[in-house]
Swiss-Prot record:
Statement: the UniProt record of this protein carries the keyword Nucleotide-binding: yes
GO biological process: ribosome disassembly
Listed GO MF terms: GTP binding; GTPase activity; guanosine tetraphosphate binding; translation elongation factor activity
Protein name: Elongation factor G 1
Family: Belongs to the TRAFAC class translation factor GTPase superfamily. Classic translation factor GTPase family. EF-G/EF-2 subfamily.
This protein's GO CC annotations: cytoplasm
Lineage: Bacteria, Pseudomonadati, Pseudomonadota, Gammaproteobacteria, Oceanospirillales
Database matches in PROSITE patterns: G_TR_1, G_TR_2
Pfam family, one: GTP_EFTU
InterPro entries per record: EFG_II, EFG_III, EFG_III/V, EFG_IV, EFG_V, EFG_V-like, EFTu-like_2, G_TR_CS
Organism this protein belongs to: Hahella chejuensis (strain KCTC 2396)
Designated gene of the protein: fusA1
Length: 699
């Protein structure tokens, strides 16, 4: 089968935003105008097509990122048919992992901001993640019909709060109830959408007199930004003071792809104004798969770095970026194809698990509807049905050209709760349900507490775990009780010290002998164990060194103070001794573990607690109560700000003090204040807190 759409006409984009900026509504409108969904789904009545899990529709927030394919040829059919793959990403702080995972496989992003609340904490998080993956992006200032909406203020926030270089391609006409349409600064014409047909048609008009001066100034900035793309444009602009429409678009495109500027558009998705212009801008200013940096991976030898270009003739390679459980077909594995072609019925190799998989059915998703396809090609986003051993972040590749694309990094959970099935019948079902949910979501972990036998689930926040338990009930029909949330404390050492670990056991016949000297140091950067082998002269044979490392690692997991894992440690093994007959790997592992245990005293061990970055938006009259309450929770106020919706308080607060905060804040402010919270870092717990935790653990 030949390719239906040339790869240059593909756009793989994500629509990212803060909760409530109107992202799902924007995506809905995109699907409506591209002709796929005939009745516009509204989030307000729980009918949006992208939000396909029951819970999302109830809570009105997007949880899973569904991938949807649609086609667009321009507002005036001015382009050839383009294929736009949209990945809808959640904006809630507890689901940051979903956003990170989507950005990893996107080529470009549309960041939706609310015209009245502008740049919010989650926007900053998404922006940082997009910078990490070097994703070119544009901004859609939505909800221009809302009270307090102000396009220019949001543009200024992009510069001040995100350090971006925003370039408005439009100016909005009016705001709030008076919002009429936008001025296209490239054409210097107003665009007014027809309300009678839900904005399907529009007309160009002259710019309103009261906006002409402002638009002329913005137009000049736009042309200047385009001229900086190359010397030819710059020289022409300096000589003639103008560029053609084509040159402006080419200049803006080149600089957007280079991540130098961020084009900004405005509108109101809910009022059917501005979304088609966003689609045009996606085609004109965001990259095709061939215009982004080719993906790199490691070949089968585990060392050689190789590149896979976005080309059908290259060997097949793809990344599994999401696993979802579908009520009708079972497990869906969403993949982004980076290179080559794959037909259903053929085999692929998963180098991360060292397993072959046979591809059965493949589908392309439109939100919750699916279309069976026979093949996927470079640039495609599709879902595979029934893959057995694939988890998020795994590579799938041609078995004859093995490559491992870079793995995604997932943060460790910061909160845990014990869950218990309500009945014996739920016991088995709960195990299956939790296993499936953990496979879908790498930031969610399940383990059994060895001492109590309880099942412990861990995640990124209270809402995250609420939704997991809710999904167990709805999708898997498992009823469960939940314990009190537990904080994921960590341990660390303050001092550098040299410790001897010696394990000797003689009991007739063959004994055990392991002896090591290890220098332990706190690690300044990174997490986990940094292990250095400085043994010389064969005082400990090198085949025992991996066992020494394993002994240290296992003890780090079990902790030295209160049974919490050690966050970071540098260990250098520099001396020791062995016995020809009695030494073995087990003896050295135990010796290393014994040395690590002694860190509790000699290493100046301390307890670390997770600190959260909290932002509260509150009416001015409740400001004193909010700040007082945060101080009571051992919070450190980092700063205060003004926003349209009230005062903004930024603080860093220990997670242990934040349980039940939503309820307390609601009652203190009659439900008028809102807050967001995300993990910031681990910090040393004060003595009185640490002592209470250590004594509770040792009972």
């Amino acid at each position: 089968m030949a390719r239906k759409t040339p790869i240059e006409r593909y756009r793989n984009i994500g629509i990212c935003a803060h909760v409530d900026a109107g992202k799902t509504t924007t995506t809905e409108r995109v699907l409506f105008y591209t002709g796929l969904s005939h009745k516009i789904g509204e989030v307000h009545d729980g009918a949006a097509t992208m939000d396909w899990m029951e819970q999302e529709q109830e809570r009105g927030i997007t949880i899973t990122s569904a991938a949807t394919t649609c086609f667009w040829a321009g507002m005036q059919q001015q382009f050839d048919q383009h294929r736009v793959n949209i990945i809808d990403t959640p904006g809630h702080v507890d689901f940051t992992i979903e956003v990170e995972r989507s950005l990893r496989v996107l080529d470009g992003a549309v960041v939706v901001l609310c015209g009245s609340s502008g740049v919010q904490p989650q926007t900053e998080t998404v922006w940082r993640q997009a910078n990490k993956y070097e994703v070119p992006r544009m901004v859609f200032v939505n909800k221009m019909d809302r009270a307090g909406a102000n396009f220019e203020r949001v543009v200024k926030q992009l510069k001040d709060r995100l350090g971006a270089t925003p370039v408005p391609l439009q100016m909005t006409i009016g705001a709030e109830d008076e919002f009429k349409g936008v001025v296209d600064l490239v054409k210097m014409k107003s665009i007014i959408w027809n309300e009678a047909d839900q904005g399907m048609t529009f007309e160009y008009q002259e710019i309103p007199a009261d906006l002409q001066e402002k638009c002329a100034k913005l137009r000049e900035q736009l042309v200047e930004a385009a001229a900086e793309a190359n010397d030819d444009y710059m020289n022409k602009y300096l000589e003639e003071g103008e560029l053609t429409e084509e040159e402006i678009k080419a200049g803006i495109r080149a600089r957007t792809l280079a991540n130098e500027i961020v084009p900004v558009l405005g509108g109101s998705a809910f009022k059917n104004k501005g979304v088609q212009a966003v689609l045009d801008a996606v085609i004109e200013y965001l990259p095709s798969p061939t215009e982004v940096k080719a993906i790199e991976g490691i070949l089968d030898d585990g060392e050689t770095v190789a590149v896979r270009k976005s080309d059908d003739n290259e060997p097949f390679s793809a990344l599994a970026f999401k696993i979802a459980t579908d009520p009708f077909v079972g497990t869906l594995t969403f993949i982004r194809v980076y290179s080559g072609v794959l037909e259903s019925g053929t085999g692929v190799y998963n180098p991360v698990k060292s397993k072959k998989e046979r591809i059965g059915r493949m589908v392309q998703m439109h939100s919750n509807n699916r279309e069976e396809i026979k093949e996927v090609r470079a640039g495609d986003i599709a879902a595979m049905i029934g893959l057995k051993d694939v988890t998020t972040g795994d590579t799938l590749c041609d078995p004859n050209n093995i490559i491992t694309l870079e793995r995604m990094e997932f943060p460790d959970p910061v909160i845990s709760v014990a869950v218990e099935p309500k009945s014996k019948a739920d016991q088995e079902k709960m195990g299956i349900a939790l296993g499936k949910l953990a496979q879908e979501d790498p930031s969610f972990r399940v383990k059994t507490d060895e001492e109590t036998g309880q099942t412990i689930i861990s995640g990124m926040g209270e809402l995250h775990l609420d939704i997991i338990v809710d999904r167990m009930r709805r999708e898997f029909k498992v009823e469960a009780n939940i314990g009190k949330p537990q904080v994921a404390y960590r341990e660390a050492i303050r001092n550098t010290c040299e410790i001897e670990g010696k394990f000797v056991r003689q009991s007739g016949g063959r004994g055990q002998y392991g002896h090591v000297w290890i220098k332990f140091e706190p690690r300044a950067e990174g997490e986990g164990l940094e292990f250095v082998n400085e043994i010389v002269g064969g005082v400990v044979p090198k085949e025992y060194v991996p066992a020494i490392q394993k002994g240290i690692e296992e003890q780090m997991q079990n902790g030295i103070l209160a049974g919490y894992p050690l966050l970071a440690l540098k260990a250098t093994v520099f001396d020791g001794s062995y016995h020809d007959v009695d030494s073995n790997e087990m003896a050295f592992k135990i010796a290393a573990s014994m040395a690590t245990k002694q860190l509790a005293g000699k290493g100046g061990a301390v307890l670390l607690e997770p600190i959260m970055k909290v932002e509260v938006v509150t009416p001015e009259e409740n400001m004193g109560d909010v700040v007082g309450d945060l101080n009571r929770r051992r919070g450190l106020i980092q700063g205060m700000d003004e926003s349209v919706s009230g005062k903004v308080v930024n603080a860093e607060v220990p997670l242990a003090e934040m349980f039940g905060y939503a309820t307390d804040l609601r009652s203190a402010t009659q439900g008028r204040a809102t807050y967001t919270m995300e993990f910031a870092q681990y910090a040393e717990a004060p003595n009185n807190v640490a002592e209470a935790i250590i004594s509770a653990r040792s009972k």
